[in-house]
A protein has these predicted regions:
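Basic, Lys/Arg- and aromatic-enriched nucleic-acid-binding interface segment
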Residues: 1-59, 63, 106, 147
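Conserved tyrosine-mediated DNA breakage-rejoining catalytic core shared by Y-recombinases
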Residues: 3-8, 55, 64-101
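Catalytic-site neighborhood detector that most strongly recognizes the C-terminal catalytic loop/helix
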Residues: 19, 81-85, 167-195
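Active-site/catalytic core of tyrosine-dependent DNA strand-transfer enzymes
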Residues: 21-26, 93-139, 150
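Conserved short hydrophobic patches within well-ordered secondary structure
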Residues: 29-32, 54, 153, 193-200
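C-terminal catalytic core of tyrosine-transesterase DNA break-rejoin enzymes
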Residues: 50, 54, 60-61, 146-170
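Short, polar N-cap/turn motifs at the start of nucleic acid-interacting alpha helices
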Residues: 69-76, 140, 158-179, 202-206
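C-terminal secondary-structure termini that scaffold catalytic or DNA-interacting sites
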Residues: 106, 115-118, 181-212
């Protein structure tokens, strides 16, 4: 497994666009937590936005996450980049790991973010919900802004990638070097989580009430 270069396509922040600055992140997270909606759909939409900003995925990548993309034992999320058809793996921070475990307990279907209203079976473009959060926190953001926010923070925290890229079809041996590499990526992802979720991170983890 080789680390991606910082400037590879998947990680680039498109120019001349917005992101949620650090001063407004707490307000944004608070709006998601406090938003009062109905039923499972509301919770799915909230979890989707949090996953988007904590992974840097494109909207369509996150919408179509399948449970086969999630390794709950290892705490990783994998996907194929539609732009270069390459397989990537992200080591989740602890909150996101808890969130995925919670969602799996609640959802035994094939999609991480299911929707009974969609022909595909998973959520598609929840712009109405995004706009409600916009109004609640008095911020204007797009789905792509969440991706840019993640990479803005990542690029200011470290010049190392938080993503692994598989370059061949062989599994790597579980040696000390690889274990240290995985833990390093997890630690850095936790730092990103701490900045994004701020004072709400520990509260959110405690509210899930399950073990990793």
């Amino acid at each position: 497994v080789n680390l991606l270069k910082k400037k590879q396509l998947w990680e680039e922040i498109p120019p001349r666009r917005n992101y949620i600055d650090v001063d407004n992140l707490t307000k944004w997270v608070q709006a998601i937590i406090e938003y009062k909606g109905r039923g499972q759909e509301n919770e799915t939409n909230k979890d989707f936005l949090l996953t988007l900003i904590l992974t840097g995925l494109f909207r369509n990548e996150c919408e179509s996450l399948h449970w086969k993309n999630i390794d709950l034992e290892e705490g990783t999320l994998s996907f194929i980049n539609p732009y270069n058809n390459v397989y990537y793996k992200i080591y989740m921070g602890n909150f996101l790991w808890y969130l995925m475990k919670k969602r799996r307990i609640q959802n035994k279907g094939e999609w991480v973010f299911p929707s009974v209203k969609s022909e595909s079976g998973h959520i598609i473009n929840i712009s109405k919900f995004r706009k409600k959060i916009n109004e609640q926190c008095n911020l204007s953001f797009t789905f792509q802004d969440l991706r840019r926010t993640f990479y803005f923070l990542l690029n200011n925290l470290t010049n190392k990638s938080l993503v692994s890229k598989r370059t061949d079809q062989y599994e790597e041996k579980l040696d000390v070097k690889n274990i240290a590499h995985a833990q390093d990526m997890r630690n850095r992802m936790n730092k990103v989580e701490q900045i994004i979720l701020g004072p709400y991170r520990d509260e959110l983890i405690k509210s899930i009430n399950i073990n990793l």
